Amino acid sequence: MKRVFTSIAIMATMLFASAQNQLFFKHMFEKKTSDESIVGLGYRDDWGFYKSEDGRFILIDMAILSAVEPSAGIICCNITFKGEGCKNEEEAKTILESKVKPAIESLANDKKNKSAYVAASMDSTKLEIFAYTYNTEELKKEIEKSKLVGKIGQNMNISFKNDKNWNIYQTKLFPDQWNYQKIQNQRIIEDLQAKGDVNTKLHIVSHFISFPLDKRENADNLAAKAKTWKYYVDQVEEEEGVVKVVFSKKSKTDLESITTVTNEVMNLAKEFGGEYVEWSTRVMRD
């Protein structure tokens, strides 16, 4: 049995909205957005798919808030196609990723309308596309002259709403921390499988939780609690400005199993005031 190490960092504190839906604009790029564009130089999108608590299937660019600032001029555009629903998660994923996303990406290449397409969602009755813009007239013209009608569906309705602080994006579209983590879990699994991993085997999965330097006692208490849950504590030490706790245990790595584990560890981290950062394992081949 050959093993190859793989580790995917999950920067949860950077990329998911807080429970209080506060803004979390991070200075990841040299140029931030201005009134001339939605995203600045160096912006990299990051699309993720998930099922929300209210039953919608959502495909969303999870990185855009890392490149923007609040602006009084920003407006949210909602493009609705009634009667274009889906039967199940598999169908929604196929439609959103292979049909809707390419269509809106082709529109996004035209920067003159100062717009960015940020999400699309489906339920059993309708399909919706969301964009943010500084220029509603140009965006509406672009949408109406595009081939969205026909490619995606009929009965299109376009509406606009002022949204300076991106509240629609954050409260109605962005995944909560549990769904965000599940998206990351799926990505790790896909990465493992691409390297030949057999996920029916038990893997030694290591979890990394961070604490502020003044919370060393909390970190020690977390490590002690993890031991009672049959985790092996690999590390509790100060590193790169935080207290790093790493513990591990054998786990299955199919999506359902590993999501159960990460939910458990995230709750444990919260109990002691820590922040769940990532999990890692080794590729296991036959």
Residue ranges and their predicted role:
Residues M1-Q22:
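Bacterial Sec-dependent N-terminal signal peptides
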